Amino acid sequence: MMTSSLSAFLGEIGRHQLLTPEQELMMGRKVQAMVAITERCHLAGGSGPACEYSDEEKGVIRRGERAKNQMITSNLRLVVNLAKRYQGKGLDLLDLIQEGTLGLTRAVEKYDPTRGHRFSTYAYWWIRQGLNRALSTQSRTIRIPVNVNEKLTKLRAAKARLMQRNGLSPSGEQLAEFMEIPIAEVEDLL
């Protein structure tokens, strides 16, 4: 059942065209305009006069939502591509796609089209961020804080580099020196 729904989803996202740079610029501006208006309400605590939109503002919000949805659906292939790379690390593919889509949504809301970057380049970081956060918070029985998980990742990378360079498993002292952190911190992580 899950395989067929995943296949249907993958088939559906494959039908959406990628956006041209001009479309990204136009839609990015619409989303920025929407975010500027809705942020005003958010900063006011979600209620009150700041949340009473004029008809023109309501139109800007509607156009922004449509542009946001189109940017998301046009870039879901990027999410799936990245999610597949993270398979087998503790979460199902569907969960990874969901978390990657949350990262993509954040990227759409934060994207500044005037900076000259393609949206997919910008979104790549946000999607990876969403996937890495999900893996660090959801893939273990005992949740390890994100900052500790990031240090563990750096420790593993340092260990691999030192093993490759020296041909031996590095000591705690060597790891601490290489990472420029106290030996006690390395021992806590190990």
Predicted segment positions?
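Alpha-helical promoter-recognition and RNA polymerase-docking modules of transcription initiation factors
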Residues: 2-143, 150-161
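Basic, amphipathic alpha-helical hairpins
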Residues: 162-166
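Helix-turn-helix DNA-binding elements, focusing on the entry/boundary residues of the two helices
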Residues: 172
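Alpha-helical residues within the helix-turn-helix
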Residues: 177
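Helix-turn-helix DNA-binding helix
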Residues: 186-187
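DNA major-groove recognition helix of helix-turn-helix
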Residues: 190
